[in-house]
Amino acid sequence: MVFRIASSPYTHNQRQTSRIMLLVLLAAVPGIAAQLWFFGWGTLVQILLASVSALLAEALVLKLRKQSVAATLKDNSALLTGLLLAVSIPPLAPWWMVVLGTVFAVIIAKQLYGGLGQNPFNPAMIGYVVLLISFPVQMTSWLPPHEIAVNIPGFIDAIQVIFSGHTASGGDMNTLRLGIDGISQATPLDTFKTSVRAGHSVEQIMQYPIYSGILAGAGWQWVNLAWLAGGLWLLWQKAIRWHIPLSFLVTLALCATLGWLFSPETLAAPQIHLLSGATMLGAFFILTDPVTASTTNRGRLIFGALAGLLVWLIRSFGGYPDGVAFAVLLANITVPLIDYYTRPRVYGHRKG
């Protein structure tokens, strides 16, 4: 008798896929709420734009391929791709950026490979990286969290800035990015990297308003804790497994601690790494993508650890302040190799 060995994914039950995607969308609510609270209504506008763009792009491709549009859209994967991209970009980024990134993610990074289950790279992170490389200024223009912001635009102002670049009173991104010290604010990771390169001491950097949080950066620590809460709920629901988040966070914390102990004057402390940027979003919502992550338990541990190491290396020595998106995509490349060497041994066969 001959058995055919198929490549992953080994199961593709649409109802099960739809349920898992829905659970992930629900788990994202705390993180979305935190970003709305600290950065204003722009996040919600970006989510709406990305969701509509993702659904339309997927429907268009399915129509061209003469596949069932309604049945495929019900798996909620397009919505999740749009959501992950929307919460990763600055809340007041121009409308066309999130549309461009989402369409690229769905059509090029997902459907071009054959659709859900066939794409080797995380589509949302492909879209994010394309935008970051193409439009670095806009993609790094985050607002200061409301704790240290001079102005937080309301819902109408957020819409006007996203679609026209100005508020009703004539304010632009330069004025909206001002902090309480009158200086344009960046993210904690971006501020740290820029200030170290400018020759500032870590002691000086930690006095900046952006680091006024209890544990890490103002606002960002609570956003990360909110994503952590959603991620723990996913674990409780058994929608994801613990291997990737744990190995990712442990490796990132270990590397950050060792680096900080050996070079405290140039490298960020571990709590800055763990509670800033897209750390918790990446650990629980992006790296755990069942299509692009390793499929064995040992492989998941290696995959998560590799991503954690890459995030620390990029943040500490690379040209970009965060690095989660690049780390995810680089780790995605290694998945076939990891799965090959960590696949379970067939019972009755000798090792090797």
Curated annotation (Swiss-Prot):
A Gene Ontology cellular-component term: plasma membrane
Residues with FMN phosphoryl threonine modification: T187
Annotated compartments: Cell inner membrane
Superkingdom of this protein's organism: Bacteria
Pfam families per UniProt: NQR2_RnfD_RnfE
Protein's membrane topology: Multi-pass membrane protein
Cofactor(s) needed: FMN
Job of this protein: Part of a membrane-bound complex that couples electron transfer with translocation of ions across the membrane. Required to maintain the reduced state of SoxR.
Subunit architecture: The complex is composed of six subunits: RsxA, RsxB, RsxC, RsxD, RsxE and RsxG.
Protein name listed in UniProt: Ion-translocating oxidoreductase complex subunit D
Species lineage: Bacteria, Pseudomonadati, Pseudomonadota, Gammaproteobacteria, Enterobacterales
Gene designation per UniProt: rsxD
